[in-house]
C-alpha cells in the first residue's frame, strides 16, 4: 500500500468525522491520564514506603520494676534481655531508652502534652532496628512474654495504615480509568463504523477490482491508532501540568521534610511508553474487531 494513499484516507476519515474523532481523543486522554495517575501513585507509594521502612523501628517496652529502678540497663534482667535481643540474627542495632529519655523524647515530639503527662507515664524501652522490617512479626512474637517485657510496638503497622490510603487512591484512579476506557472503546467502535459506512462505495469498488480486506481496512486501523496516540500525548502533557502546578506546590513541604518520595518528570517519562502501548493497543484492537464484525465482505 502506498503511503500517500494511506495518509490521504486517514486524513479523509478525520475530516468526515471531526467531532467524533475529537471526542475519542479526549476520552482516550482522560482514561489514559487517570490510568497514568494511578501508576504514579503506585510509584509514589513504593518509593515512599522504602523511605519509611528504612526508618522503621521496633520498640520493646519494659515492665514497671525495670523502668523505675534501672536507668542505665545495669541490672541482670535488663542486661539479659538486651543480650538476647542483640544476639538475634534479624537485629541490626539496639539502643536503650530509660524513663527520663522516653519522657524527653515524647515531649519533644508532642510539646502540648507537657502539662498533662508525667514522667512515670513512659516506660523504659529498647529501640530495635531490624535487618528486614517487613519481617518484624517473628521478632515481636519472640519478645512478647520475655521476662521484663511489657509490650512490643512496631511502627510498620502504622505505616501500613498510612499507605493503605495511597493504595485506595490508586485503586480509585484505576476504577475511574476503567470506566473511561469502556467509553473510549465504544467511541472507537462507533467512529470506525461511521467511517466505514461513509466510505462504503469506495471500499466496494476497491474490493471489486481485487483489493484485499487488509488493504481496505488498514486506513481505519491507522486512523483509530493515530487518534489514540494524540490522546496519549494530551494525557502525558496533562500529567506534567498537574505535576508542575499542583503537586510541586501542594507537596513541597512534604518533599523538603523527606516525608514522601518526590514525583518527578522522570517518573512520568518512565510510564509514558506503557501509556502509549495501552492507548494504541486498545484502539487498534477495538478497530480491528469492529471491522471484522461490521465489514464482513
Swiss-Prot record:
Superkingdom assignment: Bacteria
Cytoplasmic compartment residues: 1-21, 193-219, 289-297
Classification via InterPro entries: ABC3_permease_C (IPR003838), FtsX (IPR004513), FtsX_actino (IPR047929), FtsX_ECD (IPR040690)
Keyword Membrane found: yes
Protein name from the UniProt record: Cell division protein FtsX
Family: Belongs to the ABC-4 integral membrane protein family. FtsX subfamily.
Keywords, ordered alphabetically: Cell cycle, Cell division, Cell membrane, Membrane, Transmembrane, Transmembrane helix
Membrane topology summary: Multi-pass membrane protein
TM ranges: 22-42, 172-192, 220-240, 268-288
Assembly description: Forms a membrane-associated complex with FtsE.
Main location, first listed in the record: membrane
Subcellular location(s) per record: Cell membrane
One GO biological process term: cell division
Summary of the function given for this chain in its UniProt record: Part of the ABC transporter FtsEX involved in cellular division.
Listed GO CC annotations: peptidoglycan-based cell wall; plasma membrane
Topological domain ranges for the Extracellular compartment: 43-171, 241-267
One Pfam entry name: FtsX_ECD
Keyword Coiled coil set for record: no
Amino acid at each position: 500500500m502506498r503511503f500517500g494513499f494511506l495518509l490521504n484516507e486517514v486524513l479523509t476519515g478525520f475530516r468526515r468525522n471531526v467531532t467524533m474523532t475529537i471526542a475519542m481523543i479526549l476520552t482516550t486522554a482522560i482514561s489514559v491520564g487517570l490510568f497514568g495517575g494511578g501508576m504514579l501513585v503506585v510509584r509514589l507509594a513504593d518509593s515512599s514506603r522504602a523511605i519509611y521502612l528504612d526508618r522503621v523501628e521496633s520498640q520493646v517496652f519494659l515492665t514497671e520494676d525495670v523502668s523505675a529502678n534501672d536507668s542505665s540497663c545495669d541490672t541482670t534482667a535488663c542486661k539479659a534481655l538486651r543480650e538476647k535481643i542483640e544476639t538475634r540474627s534479624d537485629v541490626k542495632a539496639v539502643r536503650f531508652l530509660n524513663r527520663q529519655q522516653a519522657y524527653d523524647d515524647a515531649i519533644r515530639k508532642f510539646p502540648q502534652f507537657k502539662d498533662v503527662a508525667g514522667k512515670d507515664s513512659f516506660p523504659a524501652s529498647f529501640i530495635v532496628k531490624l535487618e528486614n522490617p517487613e519481617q518484624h512479626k517473628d521478632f515481636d512474637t519472640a519478645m512478647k512474654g520475655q521476662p521484663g517485657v511489657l509490650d512490643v510496638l512496631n511502627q510498620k503497622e502504622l505505616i501500613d495504615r498510612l499507605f493503605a490510603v495511597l493504595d485506595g487512591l490508586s485503586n480509585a484512579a484505576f476504577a475511574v480509568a476503567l470506566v473511561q476506557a469502556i467509553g473510549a472503546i465504544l467511541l472507537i467502535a462507533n467512529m470506525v463504523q461511521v467511517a466505514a459506512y461513509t466510505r462504503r462505495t469506495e471500499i466496494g469498488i476497491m474490493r471489486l477490482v481485487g483489493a484485499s480486506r487488509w488493504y481496505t481496512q488498514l486506513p481505519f486501523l491507522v486512523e483509530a491508532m493515530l487518534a489514540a496516540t494524540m490522546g496519549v500525548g494530551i494525557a502525558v502533557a496533562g500529567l506534567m501540568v498537574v505535576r508542575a502546578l499542583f503537586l510541586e506546590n501542594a507537596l513541597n513541604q512534604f518533599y523538603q521534610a523527606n516525608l514522601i518520595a518526590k514525583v518527578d518528570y522522570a517518573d512520568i517519562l518512565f510510564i509514558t511508553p506503557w501509556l502509549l502501548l495501552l492507548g494504541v493497543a486498545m484502539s487498534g484492537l477495538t478497530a480491528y474487531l469492529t471491522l471484522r464484525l461490521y465489514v464482513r465482505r
